[in-house]
Amino acid sequence: MSDVTVVNCPTCGKPVVWGEISPFRPFCSKRCQLIDLGEWAAEEKRIASSGDPSDSDDWSEER
């Protein structure tokens, strides 16, 4: 017997089975997936940083 993992859709909170049956996981639908993408694109969501913005002078792609 296999255990079924269920997560909540990050957009609407609906339960989503984590497996092949849910192609948009962790989202419940393409709609919720696109809503989330739109929030990231509009910079409504961001990853928190503990870095100091004044250290940005040291950020360089040149080594």
Curated annotation (Swiss-Prot):
Binding site for Zn(2+): 9, 12, 28, 32
Molecular function per GO: DNA topoisomerase type II (double strand cut, ATP-hydrolyzing) inhibitor activity; zinc ion binding
Record keywords, A-Z: Metal-binding, Zinc
Co-factor remark: Binds 1 zinc ion.
GO biological process, one term: regulation of DNA-templated transcription
One protein family per Pfam: YacG
Keyword Ribosomal protein on entry: no
Entry-linked InterPro entries: DNA_gyrase_inhibitor_YacG (IPR005584), Znf_NHR/GATA (IPR013088)
Cofactor requirements of the protein: Zn(2+)
Function: Inhibits all the catalytic activities of DNA gyrase by preventing its interaction with DNA. Acts by binding directly to the C-terminal domain of GyrB, which probably disrupts DNA binding by the gyrase.
Oligomer status and interactors: Interacts with GyrB.
Sequence similarity: Belongs to the DNA gyrase inhibitor YacG family.
Name of the protein this chain belongs to: DNA gyrase inhibitor YacG
Organism lineage string: Bacteria, Pseudomonadati, Pseudomonadota, Gammaproteobacteria, Enterobacterales
GN (gene name): yacG
